[in-house]
Curated annotation (Swiss-Prot):
Tree of life domain: Bacteria
Protein family (similarity comment): Belongs to the PPase class C family.
Protein name: Probable manganese-dependent inorganic pyrophosphatase
Gene name of the encoded protein: ppaC
CC cofactor: Mn(2+)
Length: 308
């Protein structure tokens, strides 16, 4: 039997890690030889989740072609967000809830993408469709992913399907959604011990009409906890622009209590962000009122503005 590795995007978040583990458990129950791995370090929120449910973190890998010939992707499809040697392996499955971009294969594959707030919402359906029981531990991981991606159902990406899935998973996991959810989000929003690199850890790269754009996001309970270190943050952002040849680096600092954000933008295309949101950056900083979702409120708007 051919072994498969399953993983989410680089700079993994809670959905990426929990989806990889959950997908692997589903496939193992069906007799597959599969292992969940990760493409980067865990953030503090995900570390809290794994510790809470006593789950070992997936193994860290930098390449996969040296181990397997087939892989499955969760929570992403764009090649620049995936493992560096993605072109050297065959993608046999994708389960995702993002736009489809910069993705093609030479062979047919299983592709499941739905416009919901979280990948594990889709995975719960797959467990049910295949009549595979969701364990208490996996239910906890899947619930955590939904809470994370929907900001405890406050994000505009959240759908009724996500809420229903979360309720079902909470029953299996035997946790109180609101109490556990706030504890989890606050664990992720504590930036007091984070390095500057860790502040920018949740970053994704996009190709927007030929421009290289990187968008990082962090959730906090007070944006000033990050803005007080703005000089260090901007220095690292600038270094990333040089190292990666980026045209724009946008850092979205989201207050999970007010559901507003502050943006820091650096690069030759910062005017595109100003046009997209009708704001003016002063010393690289501007308010982004009501913006909490990179997937729904940042990427589509910037993509459309770059295309003008």
């Amino acid at each position: 039997m051919t072994k498969t590795l399953v993983f989410g995007h680089k700079n993994p978040d809670t959905d990426t890690i929990c989806s990889a583990i959950s997908y692997a458990e589903l496939k193992k129950a069906q007799g597959a030889d599969i292992e969940a791995v990760r493409l980067g370090e865990l953030n503090s929120e995900t570390a809290f989740v794994l510790d809470y449910f006593q789950v070992t973190a997936p193994r860290l890998v930098e390449t996969v072609a040296n181990e397997v010939s087939e892989v499955a992707l969760v929570d992403h499809n764009e090649r620049q967000q995936s493992v560096d040697d993605i072109d050297d392996v065959t993608v046999v499955a994708v389960v995702d809830h993002h736009r489809i971009a910069n993705f093609e294969t030479s062979d047919p594959l299983y592709y499941r993408a739905e416009p919901v707030g979280c990948t594990t919402t889709i995975l719960l359906k797959m467990f049910r469709e295949n009549e595979v029981e969701v364990s208490k531990t996996v239910a906890g991981l899947m619930l955590s992913a939904i809470i994370s991606d929907t900001l405890l159902f406050q994000s505009p990406t959240c759908t009724e399907e996500d809420k229903v899935a979360a309720e079902k998973l909470a029953l299996i996991a035997d946790v109180d959604i609101q109490a556990y959810g706030m504890e989890m989000l606050k664990a992720g929003a504590d930036v007091s011990k984070k390095t500057v690199a860790e502040l920018l850890l949740d970053a994704k790269e996009f190709n927007m009409n030929g421009s290289k754009v990187e968008i990082a996001q962090i959730n906090v309970v007070d944006v000033n906890d990050v803005l007080s270190r703005r000089a260090e943050v901007e220095a690292l952002m600038t270094q990333n622009i040089v190292d990666k040849g980026l045209d724009l680096y946008l850092f979205v600092i989201t207050n999970i209590l007010t559901n507003d954000s502050v943006g820091i933008a650096i690069g030759s295309k910062t005017a595109v962000v100003e046009e997209a949101y009708g704001v003016k950056f002063v010393e690289n900083q501007a308010p982004l009122k009501g913006v909490v979702s990179r997937k729904k409120q940042v990427v589509p708007i910037l993509t459309d503005t770059f295309a003008k």
